[in-house]
């Protein structure tokens, strides 16, 4: 794995290399998180840094902030959202951060073989490696940026998730794994998802993981 930081504010990012398809690596992720959060509390830091708590960290809020503050969080949330309609599961009543039903790769996830015209063999997985290439999208959302760079021109025009590199990659992943039905790869919906990709290769250059949607299309 790797560590990097915003040195000026003392914010560390922990990036272990783990395969979230494997139960053993999911257990490692939780162990790493618990140990890291214990260190954060020991040194009086914040487990979210400049980020929100979200699904990944809300589970630990009561331990981090104490029961009194956790009760105040609940009071505020209940005052503004008594029916739990707005972004539920954040800050209070959070699921476990390692709940497998929240993962992109749920238990039993698999991809069948699929004939391809291009060589994807530098990536692992089924469909000659296309699976691995598609799964390089880790949902970081850089393709949704609106300032600077090129990626992703179609999303910048429509503002629709399906017209972003991430939206297209997730559609391909769901189709390859059979979650959109047996004919999804050749469906009208797939064609509609891909039609506004202008093959600019901005994603290959600017995506942090180098997702090449023009080639996949």
For each feature predicted by the language model, list its residue ranges.
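Conserved glycine-rich FAD pyrophosphate-binding loop
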Residues: 1-139, 159-161, 167, 196
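Ferredoxin-type iron-sulfur electron-transfer modules in oxidoreductases and energy-metabolism complexes
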Residues: 103-217
């Amino acid at each position: 794995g790797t560590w990097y930081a915003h040195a000026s504010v003392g914010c560390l990012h922990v990036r272990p290399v783990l395969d979230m398809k494997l139960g053993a690596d999911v257990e490692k992720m939780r162990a790493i998180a618990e140990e890291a959060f214990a260190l954060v509390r020991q040194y009086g830091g914040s487990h979210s840094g400049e980020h929100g708590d979200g699904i990944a960290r809300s589970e630990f809020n009561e331990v981090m902030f104490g029961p009194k503050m956790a009760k105040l969080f609940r009071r505020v949330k209940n005052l503004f959202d008594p029916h739990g309609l707005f972004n539920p599961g954040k800050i209070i009543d959070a699921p476990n951060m390692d709940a497998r039903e929240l993962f992109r790769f749920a238990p039993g996830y698999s991809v069948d073989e699929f004939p391809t015209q291009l060589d994807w063999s530098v990536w692992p997985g089924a469909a000659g490696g296309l699976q691995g290439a598609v799964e390089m999208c880790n949902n970081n959302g850089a393709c949704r940026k609106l300032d600077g760079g090129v990626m992703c021109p179609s999303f910048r025009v429509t503002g629709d998730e399906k017209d972003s590199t991430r939206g297209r990659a997730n559609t391909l992943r769901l189709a390859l794994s059979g979650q959109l039905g047996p004919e999804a790869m050749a469906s009208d919906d797939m064609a509609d998802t891909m039609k506004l990709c202008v093959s600019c290769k901005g994603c290959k250059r600017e995506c942090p993981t180098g997702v090449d949607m023009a080639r996949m299309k």
